[in-house]
Amino acid sequence: MVRMCFIAAAALAAAGCRTNVVRLPAGDVVLTETMLVGSDSSGKVFRGAPDGSTRITGAVKVGPWEDRGGGVRAAKLPLGADGKPVYTETLFVNGRRASRARLPDSGYFSPTVNVEETACPSSRTGWRHTLSLPPEVAEKVAAAPASELAYAQLLFHVKWDVARHPIVSYADGKLAVDGGKMADWSKWEKGDLCCIENLRSAFDAPGEWFCDAAAGEILYRPLPGEETLEAFIPCEGLETLVAVDRASDVTFENITFAMSAPVAAKGPTTLFSYQAAAFASSAAVIVDRSTNVVFRNCRFERTGNYALWFREKVRGGGAYSCEMHDLGAGGVRIGLHRWKKGEEVTSGVSVDDCLIEDGGRFHPAGVGVLIGNASDCSVVHNEICGLYYTGVSVGWSWGYAESPTQRNTVAFNHIHDIGKSELADMGGVYTLGMSFGTCVSNNVIHGVHSYSYGGWGLYTDEGSEGITLENNLVYDTDDASFHQHYGRDNVVRNNILVDSSSGQVAVTRAEDHRSLTCERNIVIWSKGDAFVKYGGTKSERAKIDWRRNLWWRADGKEEFNGTSFADWRGRVKDEGSVFADPLFADWKSHDFRLSPDSPALKLGFVPFDPSLAGRRKR
C-alpha cells in the first residue's frame, strides 16, 4: 500500500517546516493501490487546496479514440498489472457516468412467467435461474453473438435488492443465469423489473458504451455536440482509495476522493443478497480501529460503492459539511453487520451538514446513511436525495434479539425523492431491531416512491423497540407516512403525516405487548384512507396507546376505513382525539404553518419549523 506519511513527508519538506498541518497541493494524486493512513499520521491535518482541486483518485485514462463510423468511437482498454486488457463495468466521459449499452434503453422489462429455479452443481453458485423473455427482448438477445453473452449482465430487481448476474446461455426465448438459491420472501416473479447491460445489440443510443472484452476495447456513441472525449475508468480492483487504520485525531479537509471500482472482480460481476444493503463490501474511504478521524469540507464522487465507511471499532469522528454525489451505492456506512455479545462496536460517529445525492448507480440498494451495529451516532442536518432505496437506516438485528445499536440520533434531515419507483419496502428513515434511546426527530421526508409496495416515510421494521419518532413532517409517499411492521414500546408523537397515496398509518402485526404510543399527531389525507388496507384491521387490533391525535380528510367526510370516526375512536379508544381541519396555511402547497385557532393546538400539538431540516443555511 501507498502510505500517507510518505506524501505528508514530501509536502512538509517542500514547505520547509515542521507542522501537524500538511498542505496538499492542487491536482490529482493518482493511485493504483490503496493509500494507508496509519498511526504515523496521528495528530495530523491533511488540508487540500481551498478551491477543492486536490483530488485523490483511482482514475485511469482511456484513449486515444478512433472514429469507427456510424456514430461510434473506439479506444483500447488499458492494460492491467498482468499485461492484459482490464475489464470494466464503469466508464466516465467528460465528467459524466456514461450509460452501458442497455436493453431496454430506458425502463425495464419483466419475465413472462415466474422464473424457474433448478439446482446446478456445476455452477459456482449452485443454482440456475431461467427467464422467459418478452418477444421484443428475446429478439435483441438472439441478435448478440453467443461469444459475447458471457460479458452481458442481467439485473433483476427483487423487492429491496438488485441481483446482478452474467448471462450463462440463451435459447428459444429463454435466458439463463447462475445465482444463489432464492429466499422464500424474494422469489423472482413474473412482474419483477429486469434489464440487460453490456449487450452489443442494445448498443444503439447516444451516450451509451459497450465493453468488448474479447477485442480488448471500449466502444462509445458520443452525445450530440460531444466532439472531444475525456474518458476514465476506475483502476482495476481498486475499491478503496484510502484506508485509515489504528490512527487517532486525523483530519482531512478540502480533499476530493473520486473514482473507485465497484468490485474487485476481474470479470463480469455476480452479486446477489437476501437483504437490502447487505451486498456492500467496500467504500472509497474506510476507517477502522481509529479515534476521532474527521472529514471536513471533503467531496466524494463517482464512487463504485459507498463513499465513506466508519467500519470496525471506530470511536468518534465523522463527516462534516461534505458533499457526496454520483455514488455506486450509498453515502456513509457506520459499523459492521456482524456482532457478538461483548464485542466493542463503532460509536460516536457523526454525519453532519452533508449533501448525499444521486446514489445507487451500480448497487441500487445503497442507503444514504446506513448505521449497522453502532451506538451513540448522530445523523443531523443533512440533505439526502436521489437514491433508489432508503434515506437513513438504523440497526441490523431482526426480532427482539439483543442489539448493540442504541441511542442513535436522526434529526433535522431533509430526505426526498428516493425509491424512484424501482425497489420496494423502503423508508425515508428505516429502523430494525432493538434500539433503546434512539430518536428520529425534526426530519422532513417526501417523495418516497416504491415499485410494488412499501414506499414508507417513517418505517419501524422487525423488532424495532424503544425508539421515539417526533416532530417529523412526512408527505407525498406511496404508502403510509408511518408504518410499523412489528415492534415494542415505540413512541410516535407530534408528527405531521400528510396525504400518502394508499393510507396514512399502518401497523401490520398485532402482538401481545404494547406496540407503540401514538399521540398528538396531525394526520391529513385527500386520497387513500386513514390506514393502509393490509394493515388496517391489524392497526386496530394491535395494542397501541392512541391519545389526542387530530385526523382530517380533505373533503371533510367523516369516513374512516369504512366506518365513522366516532365508531373507530370508540373501538380503539383513541382518547381525546378529534376529526377536524387542522387549519394549515396551505398544506397542498406544503405550507404547514398552523392558524392560532387550530384545534391541534388545543390537543397539545407543539408547532415545529420544517425549514430547519436539511443543511444549515450558509
Regions found by a protein language model. Give the residues of each.
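Bacterial N-terminal signal peptides that target proteins for export
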Residues: 1-6
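Extracellular polysaccharide-degrading/modifying enzymes targeting complex plant/algal/animal polysaccharides
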Residues: 21-301, 340-341, 573-580, 588-618
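Extracellular, surface-exposed repeat architectures
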Residues: 46-47, 52, 56, 364, ...
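Predominantly extracellular beta-rich ligand-binding scaffolds that present long acidic/polar faces
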Residues: 32-40, 45, 466-589
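Bacterial Sec-dependent signal peptides at the C-terminal "C-region" and cleavage site
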Residues: 7-19
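Short glycine/acidic-rich loop motifs that flank beta-strands on beta-rich extracellular proteins
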Residues: 33-34, 239, 261-267, 282, ...
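Right-handed parallel beta-helix
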Residues: 248-259, 291-302, 314-329, 343-360, ...
